Amino acid sequence: MNPLKSPLEGFLNILKPPGMTSHDVVAKARRILREKRIGHMGTLDPDAAGVLPIALGQATRLIELVRGDKSYRAQLLLGRITDSQDVSGRIVEEHPIPQLTRQAWEELLKEFQGLMEQIPPMVSAVSVGGKRLYEYARQGIEVERPSRKINIDRIDIVQYHEHAPGELILDVDCSGGTYIRTLCHDIGQRLGCGAIMGWLIRRRSGPFRLQNSCTLKELEQGLAPEKLVSPGEVLQHLPNMEINERRLPALKQGLAQFLPDKNWMEGQWIRMNYRGQLLAVGQAIWQDDRWLCQPRKVLQWSESILK
């Protein structure tokens, strides 16, 4: 049961095709669904394909709380450097390709796991000085970009042949905000021969997986309601508290709710459910020698949940 007022309140796991920008996908979904409030989670390059979750209606208020970790499959091509760090860019350097065994590759890739700093590419949506980096790049201007902390949990070789040493297929699990193009570039710099990203598929974004994605064609066929994922399902990683029915009016007014004794952390996000249905999300606060949950995002719900 959908506790929210509109039948299209929640998340859709869209399969973005190559050749469309993330903005194009959102614009097309908006036209198909006739829903003004739509937002996507995590920009995908135009040439990339894969999971692009979008939020509809009230769910757009919850985007910041959705898990941001990602999984990718990518093609790494050695011996070239381009101005965009991928195959679509202008070649600026070419170098001989080194011969490496699979074992040597596995040892090398261990250096690129864990916490590290990454400088985003010039052709990216990162803002510097109030402008997107790709806007500077279009004008032929290169600006200094601050590095960002990222985490690569796993990087595995899916395919490598020693008779074709210039290409690898990699699987990467990483934190949100990681640029796989830049990872490929940095691997090439480490080897001294340069490298770029070929194709890229996002296989997972938070709880959204490639095998459960839906196409824009399916949206055109009217299948959105059955593909919709509820906010409660998407926020399963957050701890939960059940609201007593007599406290529902107070919740609607945004009043704090008493939390059972637990080792809460100040500011910790909590799902606020009634009969298993998400009605709000709040944060733990310590007040008057007890823990309370202060609602921060109260959703508009249908009175049918009381029946």
Curated annotation (Swiss-Prot):
Keywords (A to Z) from UniProt: Isomerase, tRNA processing
Gene Ontology molecular-function annotations: RNA binding; tRNA pseudouridine(55) synthase activity
Active-site residues, Swiss-Prot/TrEMBL: 45 (nucleophile)
SUPFAM superfamilies: Pseudouridine synthase
Transmembrane segments: none
EC number annotated for this UniProt entry: 5.4.99.25
GO biological process: mRNA pseudouridine synthesis; tRNA modification
Matching Gene3D superfamilies: Pseudouridine synthase
Signal peptide positions (record): none
Pfam families the record matches: TruB_C_2, TruB_N
Catalysed reaction equations from the record: uridine(55) in tRNA = pseudouridine(55) in tRNA
Family: Belongs to the pseudouridine synthase TruB family. Type 1 subfamily.
Annotated function: Responsible for synthesis of pseudouridine from uracil-55 in the psi GC loop of transfer RNAs.
Protein name, per record: tRNA pseudouridine synthase B
Organism for this UniProt entry: Heliobacterium mobile (Heliobacillus mobilis)
Name of the gene encoding the protein in the UniProt record: truB
